[in-house]
Protein backbone atom coordinates (compact mmCIF):
# COMPACT_ATOMS: atom_id res chain seq x y z
CA UNK A 1 0.00 0.00 0.00
CA UNK A 2 1.08 3.41 -0.77
CA UNK A 3 1.32 5.94 1.97
CA UNK A 4 -0.34 9.24 1.49
CA UNK A 5 1.91 12.12 2.41
CA UNK A 6 0.39 15.28 3.69
CA UNK A 7 2.08 18.54 2.88
CA UNK A 8 3.08 20.52 5.92
CA UNK A 9 1.93 24.09 6.11
CA UNK A 10 4.71 26.68 6.37
CA UNK A 11 5.17 28.18 9.81
CA UNK A 12 4.38 31.88 9.71
CA UNK A 13 6.15 32.74 12.94
CA UNK A 14 8.62 35.60 13.22
CA UNK A 15 11.99 34.98 14.86
CA UNK A 16 12.55 37.83 17.35
CA UNK A 17 15.89 36.68 18.77
CA UNK A 18 17.97 38.88 16.41
CA UNK A 19 15.90 41.91 17.42
CA UNK A 20 16.53 41.18 21.09
CA UNK A 21 20.27 40.92 20.37
CA UNK A 22 20.27 44.31 18.64
CA UNK A 23 18.30 45.85 21.51
CA UNK A 24 20.79 44.57 24.10
CA UNK A 25 23.75 45.88 22.09
CA UNK A 26 22.10 49.31 21.88
CA UNK A 27 21.39 49.23 25.61
CA UNK A 28 25.06 48.54 26.36
CA UNK A 29 26.14 51.36 24.02
CA UNK A 30 23.80 53.84 25.74
CA UNK A 31 24.93 52.72 29.19
CA UNK A 32 28.58 53.27 28.26
CA UNK A 33 28.10 56.66 26.57
CA UNK A 34 25.62 58.22 29.05
CA UNK A 35 28.22 58.95 31.78
CA UNK A 36 30.49 60.55 29.18
CA UNK A 37 27.97 63.28 28.36
CA UNK A 38 29.09 66.63 29.71
CA UNK A 39 26.35 68.75 31.23
CA UNK A 40 26.34 71.98 33.13
CA UNK A 41 29.12 74.25 34.28
CA UNK A 42 32.55 72.74 34.81
CA UNK A 43 33.33 73.52 38.43
CA UNK A 44 35.36 71.31 40.74
CA UNK A 45 33.15 71.16 43.84
CA UNK A 46 34.30 69.64 47.13
CA UNK A 47 32.65 66.44 48.29
CA UNK A 48 29.81 66.80 50.76
CA UNK A 49 30.56 65.79 54.31
CA UNK A 50 28.57 65.95 57.53
CA UNK A 51 31.20 68.12 59.19
CA UNK A 52 32.11 71.71 58.45
CA UNK A 53 35.07 72.20 56.15
CA UNK A 54 38.23 73.28 57.98
CA UNK A 55 39.07 76.96 57.59
CA UNK A 56 42.57 78.02 56.64
CA UNK A 57 43.03 81.37 58.37
CA UNK A 58 45.96 82.24 56.11
CA UNK A 59 43.79 82.21 52.99
CA UNK A 60 41.57 85.04 51.87
CA UNK A 61 37.86 84.17 51.59
CA UNK A 62 35.48 85.60 49.00
CA UNK A 63 31.77 85.07 49.61
CA UNK A 64 29.25 85.53 46.80
CA UNK A 65 25.62 85.75 47.95
CA UNK A 66 22.63 85.32 45.66
CA UNK A 67 19.41 86.72 47.16
CA UNK A 68 15.92 85.43 46.42
CA UNK A 69 15.34 88.20 43.86
CA UNK A 70 18.47 87.12 41.92
CA UNK A 71 20.70 90.02 42.98
CA UNK A 72 24.40 89.35 43.58
CA UNK A 73 26.47 90.52 46.56
CA UNK A 74 30.09 89.78 47.34
CA UNK A 75 32.24 90.16 50.42
CA UNK A 76 35.98 89.65 50.91
CA UNK A 77 37.22 88.80 54.37
CA UNK A 78 39.32 86.40 56.38
CA UNK A 79 36.32 84.20 57.14
CA UNK A 80 32.92 83.42 55.68
CA UNK A 81 30.38 85.82 57.19
CA UNK A 82 26.97 84.20 56.84
CA UNK A 83 25.09 86.57 59.16
CA UNK A 84 25.63 90.05 57.77
CA UNK A 85 25.80 91.33 54.23
CA UNK A 86 26.56 95.05 54.01
CA UNK A 87 27.70 95.25 50.40
CA UNK A 88 25.56 96.77 47.68
CA UNK A 89 24.14 94.67 44.84
CA UNK A 90 26.35 94.25 41.77
CA UNK A 91 25.73 92.93 38.29
CA UNK A 92 27.17 89.60 37.19
CA UNK A 93 29.69 91.38 34.92
CA UNK A 94 30.89 93.67 37.75
CA UNK A 95 31.26 90.66 40.02
CA UNK A 96 33.23 88.77 37.35
CA UNK A 97 35.62 91.71 36.87
CA UNK A 98 36.17 92.08 40.62
CA UNK A 99 36.75 88.35 41.14
CA UNK A 100 39.21 88.28 38.21
CA UNK A 101 41.25 91.05 39.88
CA UNK A 102 41.12 89.32 43.26
CA UNK A 103 42.15 85.94 41.82
CA UNK A 104 45.05 87.46 39.86
CA UNK A 105 46.32 89.19 43.01
CA UNK A 106 45.77 86.20 45.32
CA UNK A 107 45.19 82.93 43.42
CA UNK A 108 44.82 80.93 46.66
CA UNK A 109 41.59 82.78 47.57
CA UNK A 110 38.78 80.48 48.71
CA UNK A 111 35.43 81.20 47.03
CA UNK A 112 32.03 80.32 48.49
CA UNK A 113 28.49 80.81 47.19
CA UNK A 114 25.52 81.45 49.47
CA UNK A 115 22.31 80.92 47.53
CA UNK A 116 18.91 81.68 49.04
CA UNK A 117 16.66 78.61 49.05
CA UNK A 118 14.01 80.56 47.10
CA UNK A 119 16.42 81.78 44.41
CA UNK A 120 16.04 80.62 40.83
CA UNK A 121 18.46 77.76 40.07
CA UNK A 122 19.66 79.60 36.96
CA UNK A 123 20.95 82.52 39.04
CA UNK A 124 23.28 80.25 41.03
CA UNK A 125 24.42 78.44 37.88
CA UNK A 126 25.07 81.82 36.24
CA UNK A 127 27.19 82.84 39.21
CA UNK A 128 29.16 79.59 39.02
CA UNK A 129 29.75 80.12 35.30
CA UNK A 130 30.95 83.67 35.93
CA UNK A 131 33.31 82.43 38.66
CA UNK A 132 34.70 79.86 36.25
CA UNK A 133 35.33 82.59 33.67
CA UNK A 134 37.06 84.65 36.36
CA UNK A 135 39.55 81.83 36.94
CA UNK A 136 38.19 80.30 40.14
CA UNK A 137 39.23 76.61 40.25
CA UNK A 138 37.09 75.53 43.24
CA UNK A 139 33.79 76.82 44.58
CA UNK A 140 32.23 75.90 47.91
CA UNK A 141 28.49 76.01 48.54
CA UNK A 142 27.35 77.30 51.94
CA UNK A 143 24.28 75.69 53.51
CA UNK A 144 22.61 75.72 56.90
CA UNK A 145 23.08 72.84 59.29
CA UNK A 146 19.92 70.72 59.70
UniProtKB/Swiss-Prot annotation:
User: Can the keyword Endoplasmic reticulum be found in this entry's annotation?
Assistant: no
Q: What is its main location?
A: membrane
Q: Enumerate the InterPro entries for this protein.
A: ExbD, Tol-Pal_TolR
Q: Which residues cross the membrane?
A: 16-36
Q: Which GO terms describe its cellular component?
A: plasma membrane
Domain of life of the organism encoding this protein: Bacteria
**Which Pfam families does the UniProt entry name for this protein?**
ExbD
An example GO biological process term is: cell division
Topology relative to the lipid bilayer, per the entry, is: Single-pass membrane protein
Give the subcellular location. Answer: Cell inner membrane
What exactly does this protein do? Part of the Tol-Pal system, which plays a role in outer membrane invagination during cell division and is important for maintaining outer membrane integrity.
Question: What's the protein here called?
Answer: Tol-Pal system protein TolR
Species whose genome carries this gene? Pseudomonas aeruginosa (strain ATCC 15692 / DSM 22644 / CIP 104116 / JCM 14847 / LMG 12228 / 1C / PRS 101 / PAO1)
Gene responsible for this protein: tolR
